[in-house]
């Protein structure tokens, strides 16, 4: 059986994602569609609008055959690590293609990535007045004639780099689908039936009805920031500089900025971010670092987790079950479908902890991991 892979967040699953899934199946004619989806926390270091089980159910209902969780240690990362981890897992699941959306579906991203520039020591760019991303895009344009700036193009480029870096060009074909109707960062609902996840989340936060934009029913917005801030404020107030410095991705003296910020007694999460923010750090990076601190994820713990990946099964159809049976013994990484306390404390330690905190700030009662079984359809 041949499988195609989709790398997703589904935050929430909406009509654009449905189009992507159906188009991927149409283009590849694959026997099985595998969705690799971020769990309860998404790449920007924020909690997903609804938990991984409801989003996995939406994917299965829409026609996915297998849904696996992209573990926290890959999901809540800068784009390059996110892409490298996702491609690594899908490669082990033996997909023959990865289908992603892009603003320029006519671009050969593998060829583009093969011309990746090295801007280190490049005196043509004034790094004091431009971000690394701007310098990089300009260097790439200089070499290829293409200016990389759109969100989905950047992701496609990251997947292409991951395929090249892992020597998978003979094994996995990267194909892109043109994004339709809504831009990735669009803030407002449009008159059609496809809106960005950003716009849908914003509309939900304002009490608007979004039923025409998503097949997911009963979506609700939870104002999580106050709970998140209280937990984080306690952690930052009681941890010393050495403890904060030991956290993954806390470097370049960031611990001093964070400590100084919390000592100014910010009133909410937004004010805390504003006190830490500088040109050196994007808001996305700060979100991620603060979540790493909240979850007390040390450098060695994160590195160890990334060295020992696994496939966490969230849902499957009969065809998906057949695929797993056919491929039994051929995956290098273990497949986890049932979680007991021992597994939660060892293999799934980071994701288990992330699920517990997610439940607290989102006011969820259902367990996220222990004794949860994959969705079957």
Swiss-Prot record:
Q: Which InterPro entries match?
A: Rossmann-like_a/b/a_fold, tRNA(Met)_cyd_acetate_ligase
> Do the record's keywords include Transcription?
no
Q: Where does this chain mainly localize?
A: cytoplasm
Reply yes or no: does the keyword Kinase apply: no
List the Gene3D superfamilies: HUPs
| A molecular function GO annotation | ATP binding
The residues forming a coiled coil are none
Location comes to: Cytoplasm
Q: What catalytic activity does the UniProt entry give for this protein?
A: cytidine(34) in elongator tRNA(Met) + acetate + ATP = N(4)-acetylcytidine(34) in elongator tRNA(Met) + AMP + diphosphate
EC code: 6.3.4.-
Top EC class for this record: ligase
Cross-referenced SUPFAM superfamilies: Nucleotidylyl transferase
Which residues of this UniProt protein bind ATP? 7-20, 101, 152, 179
Q: Which UniProt keywords apply?
A: ATP-binding, Cytoplasm, Ligase, Nucleotide-binding, RNA-binding, tRNA processing, tRNA-binding
GO cellular component terms?
cytoplasm
Q: Which Pfam families match?
A: HIGH_NTase1
Similarity comment text for this entry: Belongs to the TmcAL family.
Biological role stated in the UniProt entry: Catalyzes the formation of N(4)-acetylcytidine (ac(4)C) at the wobble position of elongator tRNA(Met), using acetate and ATP as substrates. First activates an acetate ion to form acetyladenylate (Ac-AMP) and then transfers the acetyl group to tRNA to form ac(4)C34.
Q: What is this protein called?
A: tRNA(Met) cytidine acetate ligase
Q: Which organism is it from?
A: Oenococcus oeni (strain ATCC BAA-331 / PSU-1)
